């Protein structure tokens, strides 16, 4: 839901939830602060509390997710998007791996797609692109070079079209959609601080400038932008039911993830 005017989407008021509350007798609001990927739709708990003040509100906490096929992997992802790298779990019924190069990861995704379908490469928005021109924009992962996804003018979801096995999907392609296996390319905006053993975010590397359009009402825009990057990563990492494969563009992060992969097997 928008938290700022957005003429592109024909919304000119200040907040969509405010308008909905004024029009509806009953509102069922399913909310996840970790799925917000643009400043124009960025919420904080304080903002949600302020907008709903004066209305009777009942809260229900959803505690189970049905997408990622293993709780230990889901917990690992939760730690990762908070900046921590822990040893990778290696459950029997979920294939979780880190790759030193994108090419073997892509070959495995192709194999999985032949076996069970719905297996695709997806990436963070760290590689240049524009939406409406006819130029082909590419994502690189070591020796791998594949084009970004194209605008989908069909009724079929991106991952269900066979030709998209040879593309790299984005957050906008895949959000809200399930995969069986996902190969995730973590681009150069995500790095690693060895001294602190923590993830770092380099906002200058993030190519989705539309996500960062100005919000004058946000007190800490820098923190909100970092949250948006990590939210996008959270979404990408939680698409797959049976297997998740990782490649990191940053050499230090890639090495740390490979180490975490091996530590998980000890």
Predicted regions located by residue number:
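Acidic/glycine-enriched edge-of-secondary-structure segments
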Residues: 2-8, 89-96, 216-220
